[in-house]
Each structure stands twice: as structure tokens, then as C-alpha cells.
């Protein structure tokens, strides 16, 4: 029996962009216990928390670009929502959501 031919197009996944109340950050330091220190594009340094539903699926390391949601009641803390891959960071740069120079400065 012959194999069925499929004409599947490679699906292009939509890159999440920061909504209202969200900011793009770069991981500066791993602190342990699912906490990281991040530098955000708004110029603030925050303590980020990786939620339990993401900590096993998403491995975060220093220098990664992440999407974070600052807390309303403690603006110096945030939750990590999404980790961008290198190709997604390039796509954000192409769409002019963030510039490559700023990302490189934050990565140090």
C-alpha cells in the first residue's frame, strides 16, 4: 500500500508580542528556586518568577530574551510568561518590536 502524499506547508507560528502590562526582558542572573534577575526594556531591573506550569517545559538560562508581566502591587517583581527562541528574537527585530542594539546591550 502506497503512502499518502501530504502537501503540508510548514506552519509559521505567531511570535507573541508584548501586550499592555507586559515587557520584553533579558535574563541577567539565575537566582535559584525558579527565580531570575531580569533587565527589562523599560530600564528597570526586576526579580522574575518562573511559574510552576512553565518551569519543566521551558528552561531559562542567562542571556535569554523573555516576555514578562510586572506585578501591579510590587512593580519590582514580575512573572515570566514566555521565552523567545533565537529565531523569534530575529523576527521581533525584523518587525521592529525591539532593536538588535538594545538586546545586545542588555545581554552585556
From Swiss-Prot:
Record carries keyword Protein biosynthesis: yes
Protein biosynthesis as UniProt keyword: yes
GO molecular function: RNA binding; translation initiation factor activity
Start and end residues of each S1-like domain: 11-85
Job of this protein: Seems to be required for maximal rate of protein biosynthesis. Enhances ribosome dissociation into subunits and stabilizes the binding of the initiator Met-tRNA(I) to 40 S ribosomal subunits.
PANTHER family reported in the protein's UniProt record: EIF-1A
HAMAP family linked: aIF_1A
Protein name, entry field: Translation initiation factor 1A
Superkingdom of origin: Archaea
CDD domains in the cross-refs: S1_IF1A
Pfam family, one: eIF-1a
Alphabetical UniProt keywords: Initiation factor, Protein biosynthesis
Family from the record: Belongs to the eIF-1A family.
Amino acid at each position: 500500500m502506497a503512502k499518502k502524499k501530504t502537501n503540508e506547508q510548514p506552519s509559521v507560528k505567531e511570535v507573541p508580542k508584548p501586550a499592555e502590562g507586559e515587557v520584553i526582558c533579558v535574563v541577567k542572573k539565575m537566582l535559584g528556586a525558579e527565580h531570575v534577575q531580569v533587565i527589562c526594556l523599560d530600564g528597570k531591573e526586576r526579580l522574575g518568577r518562573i511559574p510552576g506550569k512553565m518551569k519543566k517545559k521551558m528552561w531559562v538560562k542567562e542571556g535569554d530574551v523573555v516576555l514578562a508581566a510586572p506585578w501591579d502591587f510590587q512593580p519590582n517583581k514580575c512573572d515570566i510568561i514566555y521565552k523567545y527562541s533565537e529565531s523569534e528574537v530575529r523576527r521581533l527585530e525584523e518587525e521592529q518590536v525591539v532593536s538588535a542594539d538594545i538586546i545586545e546591550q542588555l545581554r552585556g
